[in-house]
Amino acid sequence: MRANVQGLMSGELGNWLTEQQTMREEAKKKANNRWFYSGIAALPVAGFILFLPFDLGFFRYFLILFLGFGVFAWGYGPISEAKKTIKVGINSAIARDLGISYSHDVEPGEEYEAARRYGLLPSYQRDSQEDRWFGELEGHPFNLYEAHLEQRRGSGKNRRWVTVFRGAIIDIGFGRPFHSTTLLQRKGKHKKWFGLGGRADHADFGGHRLDYVDQVHPDFEGVFEVWSDDQVEARVLIHPTYVEHLIELERVFDGDAVRALFRAGEVIIAIESGNMFESGSMNAEDDAAKVAKTSEQFAAMARLATAINQNERGRVIANETRSEPAPAAPQSPPTGPGGFGRKGL
């Protein structure tokens, strides 16, 4: 599932991007003016703080730094808005070409709460979401967006926000019926004795108990653990052939911590893929590359969703919709935290 980048750039999207050149230039000019005049205004304020007759110690440098950050942020505002306009235009055009929809703003739903409850996401104190892609994928309801989760760490002057998760949350209707709740989690997530002992026999998720499901494949047990409230159905969902596929999937997304929750007829996937879909640029010559990169990033996410999904016979949907049995490497893997997409699917 990949957009026709060449067709988009030679058609309506390319024409629209050409029309945005004036907007880009005006945004740059406005930003430069803001930086110039606010910088002039900030200089005497910084001098006053620096040469106060009483000693503020280190705090005076913090005030000057805060003043400089304020000048930069205010000046960058027009550029930020221009890049967002370009990004929304490009991503919306890619989505239309794929027959789905795109929205920059996201209102997380039940899938987000389920991902939190069952441990697909780490604990956090601040979160934000953006870049929602939704519609149908291989005939199944599909919803994807990015999440950025942070925790406050340190103390005193070393107190700071630290990213604990930045990646994609994918919610897709599963291709075969099931009634249980089954969790595919990273190895070692749930242990006895407050995390100090060996693997637990069961885990509690907000009052919902899931029991450990034995898997005989040593390579699988070295990476994943399966937890479920229905041992029989869990083994039907994660059967021997599917286990082999999950091992290959982990190899393809090496280091990106794929995990999934099967519940209520759908599968919810979390993957630490970094910051994606940033197609907005102030330089028109970058547009074609940005469109191609964003298109490939979404295609890789779609391949991941179909690679985890199954049809009614328990076969992987991705294998049903292509002739090659092996994953195909992406043409231009995206960059960013977590190294997502190095080998593609």
What do these predicted regions represent?
Residues 48, 67, 122-124:
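Short alpha-helix boundary/capping motifs
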Residues 64-88:
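Transmembrane alpha-helices and immediately adjacent membrane-cytoplasm interface residues
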Residues 1-32:
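Cytosolic juxtamembrane N-terminal segments of multi-pass membrane proteins
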Residues 32-37, 92, 96-98, 104-113, ...:
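Charged, low-complexity intrinsically disordered regions
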Residues 42-46, 50-51, 72:
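Hydrophobic alpha-helical segments of integral membrane proteins
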Residues 50-67:
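Hydrophobic alpha-helical transmembrane segments
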Residues 29-46:
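Transmembrane alpha-helical segments and their cytosolic interface motifs
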